[in-house]
Amino acid sequence: MGTTVALTLVCVLVCGIAFAGAVFVLMPGARDRGTTASAGGSPTPDGRGPQPRPNQSPAPSVPSSTEEPLPGVDTPATPPPSTPVANTGTYECPGFSGIQLPVSMVLDDTFAWGDDPPYKVGTGSGDINWRSDPYRKPSWYMWLHSLRWLGNGIHAGQRGDRKTLTHVLAIIHDWVQDNPYSWKGDVGAWEATMHRTNVLLCARQAVLTGLRVSSLPAQYAWLDKSLVDHAQFMIVNWSGPSNHGTDESIALFGVGCTLKRPELKKLAVDRLTQAITTAIDPQGSTNEQSVGYGMFNYLLWGRATTALQRCGSSPGPVIAQRRAALSEWLALATKSTGELQQVGDAVRQKPTGAAGTALDYVASLGKRGTKPSKRVAVFDAGYIFGRTGWGETRPFAQESTYSIRYGAARRLHGHDDHMSITYSSHGRDVLIDPGHSGYQLDKWQAWSKSPAAHNVMTIPSADTAAVETRLLRASITPTWESYSLADSPAPGVTRKRDVLVLKDPDLVITLDRGQATSNQRYETLWHLAPEQKVTVQSPTAAVAMKPGDKSKTYLLQIPYQQQPPADGITVVQGQQDPVQGWYYPDIFHRQSAPVVKFNRTGTNAAILSAVVPTATTEAVTYKTRTVSGMFFVDLTVGARKATIRVLPDGRLSRIS
């Protein structure tokens, strides 16, 4: 593979989602992995791939794979304490996360990762073949070099099991001998550096505790030398102000604290101080364009704060301020179902609460913590989060929640999801994001990041690209919100979307308008949750319902300026060529899920949609009328009524 693909694999190795029981936790990442799938489904660079690190030289490739990676966990189960911790002058072993192996496997030099069979990588004496790559999976190779799989052996050694401690140290020493500084020529060893640094620190602590000594015995001097080498590697190859760079800075601080090297501590603190203002903006938005990575950022910076305080360095006020803002951001980004919005690279997960915060409020479904001060918020970074309430007049889970994306073009862990809407109501997901297909550069990732995987108007006949989307106006009232957005996704093509979100009855109205200099295919897509069965009743109406459920969803294409054609509504599900109609609850599982398309062909299109969740016993009807150039829709949902006004410029509002 060429240098570009090799550099892309650098991120494939470290940006992941871990599976530990039923908990999914995001790993840090620092670079974009945009791809375009070839006809055969194999990955090719699309020109928006990873940016080289400062002074980065070409790195050799690691064999690619069509399998989805399964990296290890790198976040604590609960957030670090919000109150200052005692200064003990030490760096605490951060643990080994979700890829620990039984001690018996460690003693047998056998490594296992993901769902692949265990593989004997050594002789049984700690002599490891560090070039082992039996399954040709970049992440398998990187986690082998991380040494995190030695965690249970290190714990055993710390408890006094000298046989196991000796074997673990033999494996670590073998890595040090077989991978001399600088190991930058090996992508897997390179990208595992920050993880391996922490393992070395944990092993050093296990030696002191297991042998009941206060200073490192001379026979293990190589361990401290290797820690210095790892620190030097991270100094020279810092990833910058990103999640990955922040993790490196914490590990660098750990070396400085452990070896009493104040210059390393200072450099780490300086880098953290620089990174925090990029990682989290003053409004609480992260630079990763992902709600899931927002949760990771919250935990990561809590870990940084604790590490600094425990070893006598002040984290300063900015980290606490930005984390507090991010806590509010994440609370607003939590659906009424109690899960985070799956926006950007994000798996299905619940937020992790911190005592007394707004995040704790949503994590407990309103039972504790502090209720967020806002019901709806518009963030400059390109996020709109809204809800009908916080459970004041109806159960928390029965509120309706939504998200809308706009802003800067896709980067890092973002998707081409501008103008997309997610929506939850009646205790369930109605409009979904595709989720996170993983880090393998294949047709599935290309689709999951594309506009076709989101609830937007797409122009599949045009050569579209990731572009900035402008929020032109926003109106927030007690019973409705409206937004106007615009962009130009392709040369000679403009796209506008007006959105109206109602409370009582809870529903979403959108007006999509596309205009081009030549005939185009326009499709407004509505991605529904898996197991929904869609019945197309006419070119203007479809109904979706999960068998046995107590609610259903009406999807209405209301005639406006144009009469929908005979094939005005089509449904796609579980399609592989081209990919369409799927959902990823996590990177390991893919489920078919229906996509309802509202279709047009021509130089322009005007598609007025209504997405109306109801009880199964309720009916939805509407009438339209035009008065003085204004278009009105009189909607009836069960016994509730609402009148929607469409102004000539497309603005939507509720007038009753």
Residue ranges of predicted features:
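Aromatic-lined, polymer-binding surfaces characteristic
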Residues: K137-R323
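A residue-level signal for conserved active-site and pocket-lining positions in enzyme catalytic cores
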Residues: D46, W149, L252, D512, ...
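Extreme N-terminal leader/anchor segments
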Residues: G72-T123
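CBM-like, beta-strand-rich accessory domains located in the C-terminal region of large
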Residues: A346, S437-S656
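Core hydrophobic alpha-helical transmembrane segments of single-pass membrane proteins
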Residues: C11-A20
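N-terminal export and membrane-targeting signals
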Residues: M1-C11
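N-terminal low-complexity, Pro/Thr-rich disordered segments
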Residues: A22-V85, R348-R368, S656
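Carbohydrate-active enzyme catalytic cores, enriched for enzymes
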Residues: F253, D281, S285-L431, T477, ...
